[in-house]
Swiss-Prot record:
Pfam families reported in the protein's UniProt record: Mastoparan (PF08249)
Signal peptide stretch: 1-27
Protein name, as recorded: Mastoparan
Organism, scientific name: Vespa orientalis (Oriental hornet)
GO cellular component terms attached to this protein's record: extracellular region; membrane; other organism cell membrane
UniProt key word Signal: yes
Length: 60
């Protein structure tokens, strides 16, 4: 059960990241795609480290 929840949560975060990066790429087509998300351009960018820490804390 724990593994299923972790897999679903990871897939959800991956989809959020995919759509977030797509929206940012459309907003700034000249940006370097290998540079990663730009927190200044997108103040609501997903903080993956904080999410990973929360998942670790919740799932033990």
């Amino acid at each position: 059960m724990k593994d299923t929840i972790l897999i679903l949560f990871t897939a959800f975060i991956a989809l959020l990241g995919f759509f977030g990066m797509s929206a940012e790429a459309l907003a700034d087509p000249l940006a370097d795609p290998s540079a990663g998300p730009n927190a200044e351009a997108d103040p609501e960018a997903i903080n993956l480290k904080a999410i990973a820490a929360l998942v670790k804390k919740v799932l033990g």
